[in-house]
Amino acid sequence: MSVAKSDKEYVVKVNLKGSRRVSRTIALRGDQTLDDLHEAIFAAFDRFDAHLYSFYFPKAPGRRGTAGPKPKEYTAPQMFDEPDPLDDQSRFDASATKLDDLRLRPGQRFEYLFDFGDSWWHEGTVEAVNPSVPRARYPPIRESRGASPPQYEAVDE
């Protein structure tokens, strides 16, 4: 955890996609990164085995009945270790992206994918943007609803 430096605090509610009964509400400072948000979600959902991840932020909604533009993707820094000739340069490094840089606002939604193999999809909503609390330690978990499902299904031998 780190001590407050940014003047903004972002309160984010994250739930497992398709299950509003399992959610975590987390607060982070504006100078923390999407990688910090990933680490907070990882811990809040009782995960133990690290995997790649990406955040997806819609650029703008499409007109009714049409798809909007491709969302901006912010992904794990490990994805940039080796050049990918097929990369269309549309991905951004989550560890280099501060929450303040995203200009988040209450009600804004995003998606978070953890583990590209098992595809743990989450839905996120910015619940509030508040003044940060001086000398507070971030990221605190403000609310935890429902039990986290196991990261891996039990295998019968």
Predicted segments — roles?
Residues 1-157:
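Short linear regulatory motifs enriched in tryptophan with gly/pro/ser
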